[in-house]
């Protein structure tokens, strides 16, 4: 339940959020959520722009963390009442962070595509900063957690930085159309990794390259190897009797949701002749929303039976996270960690079990795109402003009612 500003998962979340809005813009529009999505993304990209220090048109530094993980974790209360040390940490030429700078570049480039239509001036600003960050990332190379050592305890760069370089290059190609970025992306692309996450971008890149290079089957093979693992229950993925694709104790719902988003994108934009990847994508989102043996929704505030104790300090409303009472505030829309083992009953709605109940930016990033796809494909009825206002803790300005 911390409030440390960890730059790596934050930037990775913005990239995925923007990708979802780019791919399924109509789904966001039809559900009445495009403005909200763009506001959320701009909140994140505005922060990344502020964290980016330039001089003479070049990156001088990028602030990749604010706060100390252990100190922040020791406090569980309202953020407005925090009285703890919150130092800022940066990467620069002497203390590089290739993966962090490249991920920030990818986020800004992905968002630039999204804002191009409605706010071209802002899109240009995003793209200029994305190019500067990429040049810096490519020139000064090292894992960011070697420079920002406090981050190594929580978001360590385990698999190097080549995947982030290829990821950024592919997004820059999509944002600019300049072949030089595509050429570099193909050179840096390293093939199959673990799974798409804040720290591993191989599979997202394989799908982007499969879109860009339809005649080069390697990217399709790599993407489908990963997607088949998820759809078939192989390569570390295990299925519960109720149909949940489980991969890891930490954030199992997040991993399945992100895989679902990418499976949907691949099915819709590359190929899926048997409908296998679309079926996987939809089945996992259905499971997370309550179509499971326990009829339990892992999305807070959705359905009749949902997670009531997400591990989130402000939502809890008390400094004692061991209190048995449900959270004082409903954290609408948050996706909790999910089952901690490949078992439909391996989840406890207990705040102190932070492995199962933690919430995070990257937990919702791919999930949101997957939901937009579902709305785009199957439709639905969005809540009216009047209905939203009736929800506890939700307020809609009168001018919009």
Predicted regions and their residues:
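N-terminal carbohydrate-binding/catalytic regions of secreted carbohydrate-active enzymes
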Residues: 1-11, 117, 123-127, 131, ...
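Aromatic (Trp/Tyr) and acidic
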Residues: 1-23, 65-103, 107, 111, ...
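Short coil/linker segments at helix-helix boundaries
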Residues: 19-43, 84-92, 110-127
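Helix-capping and short linker residues that terminate individual alpha-solenoid repeat units
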Residues: 25, 53, 116, 138, ...
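Carboxylate/His-rich catalytic cores and anion/metal-binding grooves
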Residues: 40-57
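Proline-centered turn/helix-capping motifs that create local helix->coil transitions or kinks
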Residues: 52-64, 141-146, 177, 297
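Acidic, Ser/Thr-rich low-complexity linear motifs
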Residues: 146-157, 196, 239-249, 301
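Solenoid-like repeat scaffolds
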Residues: 189-196
